[in-house]
Design a protein with these regions (language model features):
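C-terminal substrate-binding subdomain of Rossmann-fold SDR/epimerase-dehydratase oxidoreductases
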Residues: 27-137
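Active-site micro-motifs of SAM-dependent methyltransferase domains
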Residues: 7-10, 24, 40
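Active-site Tyr-X1-5-Lys
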Residues: 1, 24-28
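Conserved beta-loop-beta element that borders a ligand/cofactor-binding pocket
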Residues: 1-11, 32
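Short beta-loop-alpha junction of Rossmann-like oxidoreductase domains
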Residues: 11-17
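Long, contiguous hydrophobic alpha-helical segments, chiefly transmembrane helices and signal peptides
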Residues: 18-19, 44
Length: 137
């Protein structure tokens, strides 16, 4: 089985990535953040859910010899992440678009299909609670 993980997020993630960068700014009560394009959308999946799904996949006979996306099937924009963090921390942060963070060939939307994952496991992949995952970080 080949597992194609999408954007795994959660406790212990490298602070150089966008989600922990956002969380740390809110935790530190910073008033502004310099970012690139906040309208790009990515398929995030919780690290704990990822571990459970991998455990299930390695024992699922239907997954043998398959290439399977490890994803949630739903895209979330950076703007959406910021909105949820503003709800969690109770304040609005000023977003400054910084050209050094804007990618020339940005992929606007990157979302995986859960169809094969669900087929291999014989069950529906639970939807991630973005509020809960960000709160735990």
């Amino acid at each position: 089985t080949v597992i194609r993980p999408f954007n795994v997020i959660g406790v212990g993630q490298n602070p150089d990535f966008i989600v922990p960068k956002l969380v740390s700014h809110f935790k530190e009560n910073k008033k502004e953040i310099h970012l690139g394009n906040i309208n790009t959308s990515r398929d995030y999946i919780d690290v704990y859910a990822s571990c459970e799904l991998i455990k299930d996949l390695i024992t699922a006979e239907k997954s043998f010899g398959q290439i399977v996306n490890l994803c949630g099937g739903t895209g979330h924009s950076v703007a959406e992440l910021i909105e949820v963090l503003q709800q969690i921390y109770g304040y609005k942060i000023k977003v400054i678009t910084d050209p050094k963070f804007v990618r020339k060939n940005e992929v606007w939307r990157l979302t995986g299909s859960v169809d094969k994952l669900e087929s291999c496991l014989g069950k529906q992949v639970p939807k991630m609670d973005l509020h809960e995952v960000l709160s735990e970080m």
